[in-house]
Amino acid sequence: MSQQHTLPVTLSPALSQELLKTVPPPVNTHQEQMKQPTPLPPPCQKVPVELPVEVPSKQEEKHMTAVKGLPEQECEQQQKEPQEQELQQQHWEQHEEYQKAENPEQQLKQEKTQRDQQLNKQLEEEKKLLDQQLDQELVKRDEQLGMKKEQLLELPEQQEGHLKHLEQQEGQLKHPEQQEGQLELPEQQEGQLELPEQQEGQLELPEQQEGQLELPEQQEGQLELPEQQEGQLELPQQQEGQLELSEQQEGQLELSEQQEGQLKHLEHQEGQLEVPEEQMGQLKYLEQQEGQLKHLDQQEKQPELPEQQMGQLKHLEQQEGQPKHLEQQEGQLEQLEEQEGQLKHLEQQEGQLEHLEHQEGQLGLPEQQVLQLKQLEKQQGQPKHLEEEEGQLKHLVQQEGQLKHLVQQEGQLEQQERQVEHLEQQVGQLKHLEEQEGQLKHLEQQQGQLEVPEQQVGQPKNLEQEEKQLELPEQQEGQVKHLEKQEAQLELPEQQVGQPKHLEQQEKHLEHPEQQDGQLKHLEQQEGQLKDLEQQKGQLEQPVFAPAPGQVQDIQPALPTKGEVLLPVEHQQQKQEVQWPPKHK
């Protein structure tokens, strides 16, 4: 009986799944179904009602009777568990497919946001690492600076300790017995006085020589430990060891003196090499001044300038006298430069003095070295004199600036002189043009006088027709046209007077006096030609009367007007020749 009861129970979930598959939910109502709670299957008693009709009635009765005997809770649990799992899986799958189909943009956005977050995290990590590295470097630098400051602060304290040490040694030197005991040198100390091989190698290298002028590493170590030196002073045996070291340092001092001699020789050679460069600069400056003097000489050869320009020329001549003063100043500059070289040499000596003082603080020097130190201190008094010379140098530099300003003023004066010359040339041209205008007016007056009035001629209108027949020959007509052209050329049009461009061109042509002389000669020739042409014109304008064929007419002389007396033709020509020279205003 148990087997018969279990069979219908196992079939019920399969049947319920088939029913769910046959009726799929619509797409639009998917969201509503997600919101609503999932429908649970009916209880076990109603399940056989949904079964098809083909099931026989006997089995239904058996099934109903069997199910009634089971508890309701077990039936619900057995039906709910597999159904809920399957339904949840289906809903998740449908929901994911729907999101993929409708929201591809959201997926892209999500991917981008994820990538951005990852990149931001990486950048933040890198920034943190860099900040840590920078902090570490800053801490190291601060520590180094602190160490340097401490060392610098320790130096004056060490120097004070050395001074105390010197005072103690001087007190010891006052006692002759102690000095004699300390100055006795054993054979080992004499062996140490000899130059070691390392010092000989240092003499060969100039770079190492300069390094030896500075404090050696051993001395720096001694400076850092003043307390140990004070302890050494108390012990006589340790003082003897220090004396041995002092003898070694005396050997080093001798070497340093040799090195100083070599350095002086090198500095002297460098000073000699620097001198030709300065001489080249002076030569260039002198060449420029010579060019300016030549330019001034050329300007003086030109025509005399007005009174204002003469005053400017005098000022320029005064400025020309200044180059001599400049040459003297240049000589002073050279002397000062030599003194600067001496200053540098003294500064080097001061550095050596400081080096020797440090050595004195460590190991008391003998009396000969003390005398040398006094001599060097006397030499230190020279820098005051050199400071005065430096003040003179500054004064000379200021004078050089003033000279440059004067040179600029000379250039401006030259430009003004050129402008004045240009204006004078324009004035001369204007005067020349006015003279030409006066000549033209005078010619027009003469032409008006030469024209014979109709009353004086007294010829009838018939004579005019005869004059037309008796035209001048072709040569005379060509001469008349040539005269008219020359008159037109001599006339000054109004446009020429108002146009400065034409005047500027004329000024360029009239810059040289030789060209002006040639132009004056050319104008004189033109005036002579004009005189000849006017005489020819006067001759051609005299009336020539010829009677027509078959007619004889009495030609009456022209009656003079009131107050006029007729003169023969010769007298009239003489009058014309007398009136020719133009009246200059």
UniProtKB/Swiss-Prot annotation:
Subunit and interaction comment = Directly or indirectly cross-linked to cornifelin (CNFN).
- Primary residence: cytoplasm
Q: Does the keyword Hydrolase apply?
A: no
| sequence repeats (start-end) | 153-162, 163-172, 173-182, 183-192, 193-202, 203-212, 213-222, 223-232, 233-242, 243-252, 253-262, 263-272, 273-282, 283-292, 293-302, 303-312, 313-322, 323-332, 333-342, 343-352, 353-362, 363-372, 373-382, 383-392, 393-402, 403-412, 413-422, 423-432, 433-442, 443-452, 453-462, 463-472, 473-482, 483-492, 493-502, 503-512, 513-522, 523-532, 533-542
Q: Where is the composition biased (Low complexity)?
A: 179-261, 361-383, 445-462
Q: Name one Pfam family in it.
A: Involucrin
Its subcellular locations are: Cytoplasm
Biological process terms in GO annotation: isopeptide cross-linking via N6-(L-isoglutamyl)-L-lysine; keratinization; keratinocyte differentiation; peptide cross-linking; response to UV-B
Q: How is it modified after translation?
A: Substrate of transglutaminase. Some glutamines and lysines are cross-linked to other involucrin molecules, to other proteins such as keratin, desmoplakin, periplakin and envoplakin, and to lipids like omega-hydroxyceramide.
Q: Where is this region: 39 X 10 AA approximate tandem repeats of [LP]-[EKG]-[LHVYQEK]-[PLSQE]-[EQDV]-[QHEKRGA]-Q-[EMVQLP]-[GKLE]-[QHVNLD]?
A: 153-542
User: Organism classification, top ranks?
Assistant: Eukaryota, Metazoa, Chordata, Craniata, Vertebrata
Tissues in which the protein is found: Keratinocytes of epidermis and other stratified squamous epithelia.
In this record, residues modified by a lipid of the kind Omega-hydroxyceramide glutamate ester are Q79, Q118, Q133
Start and end residues of each stretch annotated as Disordered: 1-132, 149-540
Instruction: List the GO cellular component terms.
Output: centrosome; cornified envelope; cytoplasm; cytosol; extracellular exosome; nuclear body
Family of this protein: Belongs to the involucrin family.
Q: Cross-link (Isoglutamyl lysine isopeptide (Gln-Lys) (interchain with K-? in other proteins)) at which positions?
A: Q496
- Identification of the protein by name: Involucrin
- Mind telling me which InterPro entries this protein's record contains? Involucrin_CS, Involucrin_N, Involucrin_rpt
Q: Where is the composition biased (Polar residues)?
A: 1-15
In terms of domain of life, where is this protein from? Eukaryota
What is the stated purpose of this protein? Part of the insoluble cornified cell envelope (CE) of stratified squamous epithelia.
In terms of PROSITE patterns, this protein maps to: INVOLUCRIN
Per the record, where are the segments of Basic and acidic residues compositional bias? 92-115, 159-178, 262-271, 292-304, 314-328, 341-360, 384-393, 415-424, 431-444, 479-488, 501-535
**Keywords linked to the UniProt accession:** Cytoplasm, Isopeptide bond, Keratinization, Lipoprotein, Repeat
